[in-house]
């Protein structure tokens, strides 16, 4: 057999697939079982959620980063097949990670919980898989639960998604039931990769990470051609050229191989020192015989939420920059730029896909890079149209132009889809109305599950909406949102003043109808959180020049009369006058320290008034 025939024969036995599911429907457990079944790992190495390598992932029990692993499986037809399993996250903020994983596959296993049925996220991920023309294999998981209703869920998959579920495997990843059927279905139904191993090299970078010894490690899926160590490669987006030092696959440990050819999913190192040279979604081709055109990469993701990150110790500003550079390498949806604040010093304005993404990045910086952070209130991007016809894009409330010059302000709206049990429909609708939502549609999926659709301002969803939705439905609701565009709203910027000075990091943008109540709540909260000073401190909320709410932090009092026993009233009065004068002078020059809790208070408006 020639090299080419060998490669083509091997190619016909490759199956690339990923597992998609809503959070907690069991995809990491299923991945564990598949690894055991194909004996990719010994019992000794087995631990729960094997592919979730980040500590954070294991603690929270969620998958954040995608991971890939190569498995060998001896099927019933006697052939040995090569599987590439690419693990994907299930949370709404990480949809991008999912779309990257799916671009590297030909098939997807759709895991649906036999007790809970289809959730909002399941749908979102299925549509992504259909966009990528993948073969979808439905699997109904957790059939060993007492509350499992596999037949109802099978019907739901057919009705809601429109997939043929007659051959859906009934499985329990935990108990190891049905795993073999799943593997056999992968062999039969998932198509082998197409592509010519002799053609010019084309490989898609779907992830990358930085290794202190080897430089950048790129995770690639070879679409056409072959790549070997010693070969010169070129990045199509940047035009940079490198020499490959090592290629290999994950079994789950990184294992070097002689070459990667069509359909292989593995890694490549080429002494790439600069983090920016390997963009995720870029195409690698050979320098000597480059491909004509790049693979369709990923769409560049735009952040939805911005917030300021500042190191508590200002000397760590450069460490924070390095941390962000390294995180940006394998999380291309993170964006950041330097900014300064009078209250907090030097820091960065960072863009995230959503609140969970923001929390995860914050935690990763604090853990992996050991930098303590202060974060400012998250805000979305507003389009501000000026009276002179100019349009200004505002992602930081303190950059809001002067209200006199503003003609209108537009804010991003999202279409929010919530799947809720029947009993909680009223509570959810009330919550959405309170968040300035517009009711669009409501459908009954079956006797006790309802899908509710609202158009809502992204700014209202950004903070705590998900938590409030969960608590108003006892944790049963699931939620997914997509951006639909910008709409004009009556928005104003609210400044918080301490002792007559504006604190730039506490400013936020609010709807005019809610401004008074929001101002009142914040002023009261700050009054509790800011420590008392030697002098009286007024806390005010202002819109432009107009003060809408005020409260006063009382001064601490020293008893200056303690040393006067009895004595003349004029003597006492003199001491009190002197104290009063001292306090007045102090008030003119005194500055007030704002604790971190005060910044968080502006965000946590959970007791903000509901608009009737």
Swiss-Prot record:
Belongs to the TRAFAC class translation factor GTPase superfamily. Classic translation factor GTPase family. LepA subfamily. Its main location: membrane. It comes from Bacillus subtilis (strain 168). One of its GO terms (molecular function) is translation elongation factor activity. HAMAP family: LepA. Its EC number is 3.6.5.n1. It catalyses: GTP + H2O = GDP + phosphate + H(+). This is Elongation factor 4. It is a peripheral membrane protein. GTP binds at residues 24-29, 141-144. Residues 12-194 form the tr-type G domain. InterPro entries: EF-4 (IPR006297), EFG_III/V (IPR035647), EFG_V-like (IPR000640), EFTu-like_2 (IPR004161), G_TR_CS (IPR031157), LepA_C_sf (IPR038363), LepA_CTD (IPR013842), LepA_IV (IPR035654). It is found in: Cell membrane. PANTHER family: TRANSLATION FACTOR GUF1 HOMOLOG, CHLOROPLASTIC, TRANSLATION FACTOR GUF1-RELATED. GO terms for biological process: positive regulation of translation. It holds the Pfam family LepA_C.
């Amino acid at each position: 057999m020639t090299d080419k025939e060998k490669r083509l024969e091997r190619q016909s036995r490759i199956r690339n697939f990923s597992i998609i599911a809503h959070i907690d429907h069991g995809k990491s457990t299923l991945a564990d079982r598949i690894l055991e079944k194909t004996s990719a790992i010994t019992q000794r190495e087995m631990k729960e959620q094997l592919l979730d390598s980040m500590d954070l992932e294991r603690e929270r029990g969620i998958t954040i980063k995608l991971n890939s692993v190569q498995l060998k499986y001896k099927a019933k037809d006697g052939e040995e097949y090569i599987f590439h399993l690419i693990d994907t996250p299930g949370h709404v903020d990480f949809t991008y990670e999912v779309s990257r994983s799916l671009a590297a596959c030909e098939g997807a296993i759709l895991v649906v919980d036999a007790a809970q049925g289809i959730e909002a996220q399941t749908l979102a991920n299925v549509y992504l898989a259909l966009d990528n023309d993948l073969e979808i294999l439905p699997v109904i998981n957790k059939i060993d639960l007492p509350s499992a209703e596999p037949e109802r869920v099978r019907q739901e998959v057919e009705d809601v998604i429109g997939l043929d579920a007659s051959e859906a495997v009934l499985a329990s990843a935990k108990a190891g039931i049905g795993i073999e059927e799943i593997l056999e279905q992968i062999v039969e139904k998932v198509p082998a990769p197409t592509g010519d191993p002799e053609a010019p090299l084309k490989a898609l970078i779907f992830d990358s990470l930085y290794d202190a010894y080897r430089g950048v490690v790129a995770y690639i899926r070879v679409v056409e051609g072959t790549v070997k160590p010693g070969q010169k490669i070129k990045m199509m987006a940047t035009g940079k050229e490198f020499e490959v030092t090592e290629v290999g696959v994950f079994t789950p440990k990184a294992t070097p191989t002689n070459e990667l050819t069509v359909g292989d999913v593995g890694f490549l190192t080429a002494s790439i020192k600069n983090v920016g040279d390997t963009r995720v979604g870029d195409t690698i081709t050979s320098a000597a015989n480059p491909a004509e055109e790049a693979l369709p990469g990923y769409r560049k993701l735009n952040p939805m939420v911005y917030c300021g990150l500042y190191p508590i110790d200002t000397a760590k500003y450069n460490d924070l920059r390095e941390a962000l550079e390294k995180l940006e390498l394998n999380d291309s949806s993170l964006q950041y730029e330097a900014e300064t604040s009078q209250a907090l010093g030097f820091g960065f304005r960072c863009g995230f896909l959503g609140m969970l993404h923001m929390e995860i990045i914050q935690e990763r910086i604090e853990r992996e890079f050991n930098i303590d952070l202060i974060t400012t209130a998250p805000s979305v991007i507003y389009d501000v149209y000026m009276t002179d016809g100019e349009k200004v894009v505002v992602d930081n409330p303190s950059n809001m132009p002067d209200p006199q010059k503003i003609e209108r302000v537009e804010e991003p709206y999202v279409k929010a889809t919530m799947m809720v049990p029947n009993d909680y429909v009223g509570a959810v609708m009330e919550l959405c109305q309170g968040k300035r939502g517009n009711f669009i549609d409501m459908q009954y999926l079956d006797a006790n599950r309802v899908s509710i659709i609202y158009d809502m301002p992204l700014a209202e969803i950004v903070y705590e909406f998900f938590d409030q939705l969960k608590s108003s439905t006892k944790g049963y609701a699931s939620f997914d949102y997509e951006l639909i565009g910008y709409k004009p709203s009556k928005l104003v910027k609210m400044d918080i003043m301490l002792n007559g000075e504006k604190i730039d990091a506490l400013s936020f943008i609010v709807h005019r109808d809610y401004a008074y109540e929001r101002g009142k709540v914040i002023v009261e909260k700050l009054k509790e959180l800011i420590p008392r000073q030697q002098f009286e401190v007024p806390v005010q909320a202002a819109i432009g020049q107009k003060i809408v709410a005020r409260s006063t932090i009382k001064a601490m009092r020293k008893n200056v009369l303690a040393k006067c026993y009895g004595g003349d009233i004029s003597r006492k009065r003199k001491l009190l006058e002197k104290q009063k004068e001292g306090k007045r002078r102090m008030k003119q020059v005194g500055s007030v320290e704002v604790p971190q809790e005060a910044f968080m208070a502006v965000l946590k408006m959970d007791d903000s008034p509901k608009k009737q």
